[in-house]
Amino acid sequence: PMETRFSFICISEEFKFKVRDALESAGLGNIIITYTNSSDREELMEVIENSDVIITSPGRYKELYEINNGRRQIINFLYSLDDGSVKALKSKLLEIKYSK
């Protein structure tokens, strides 16, 4: 549904902004996405609790998988920020958004 809440969790501040800009350029600026690169476990647990779907960079996947404990869907964003990768992520986000 339109109100699906996404979170994008990665390691670096720079990558966080690159992904946000790429998703906005791909027409996903209207999707509710919280971006963070926090390493604070309590903060990450709060972000997960306030999300329906977690998108993560490969470097954070294992950590978030353990914290999440099966509560939310996790998308492991295997990336290079080319048009194909962004389009694939856009397709997956829209599929999730409209399937609920």
Swiss-Prot record:
Domain of life the protein comes from: Bacteria
Protein name: Uncharacterized protein in mutS 5'region
Organism expressing this protein natively: Clostridium tetanomorphum
